[in-house]
Amino acid sequence: MLKRHAYDQLLNWKNRKTKQGLLITGARQVGKTTLIEQFGADHYEHVAKVNFIEMPQAVETVSKAKDTEDLILRLSVLSGTEITPGKTLLFLDEMQACEDMLTWTKFLSGAKGLDVIVSGSLLGIDVFNVRSIPVGFLQTMRMYPLNFYEFCAACRLPQPALDTLRECYVDRREVPDYL
């Protein structure tokens, strides 16, 4: 996997223990899903993922939940993973397809103490259709395409070469042609 600066932001969110869910937005194809899945695999025993576009039946299933316990059971069935606070990352992908789910995150992350990450490429536009945005219960993060440094690292440019590039930029010198 590519080393992304956003990974460190995910780690900071996890370590802060604020009982806040994390909302990750960004353009399509910038690596949101891949990053979250890798983070979950690295730091949790289980990742319970529900993608509301790939699983259209999930929207109806979630909308019929009576309370938080019922919702957790439904999400567990949809993801095929037991959801346990402290051991499971609940990853709700393409949230723009299920407006009610954003409201539920308040209860999942706050009262139930679950680590919840919600993501979607069009979420920033569609979030305004939600009845009750959980103010104070969601930390937000915007993800961007690779920056230049991440790109160079992905191309396996050695650290001394990256340092040389940085020095050339700071000193406004020409970059050596071998770089």
Listing of model-derived features with the role each one plays in the protein:
Residues 24:
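Hydrophobic anchor at the beta1->P-loop junction of P-loop NTPases
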Residues 32:
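Conserved lysine of the Walker
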Residues 35, 39:
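Hydrophobic positions on the alpha1 helix immediately C-terminal to the Walker A/P-loop
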Residues 91, 115-121, 142, 151:
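Structural recognition of the conserved hydrophobic beta-strand(s) that form the central parallel beta-sheet
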Residues 110-131:
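Sensor-1/coupling segment of RecA-like P-loop NTPase cores
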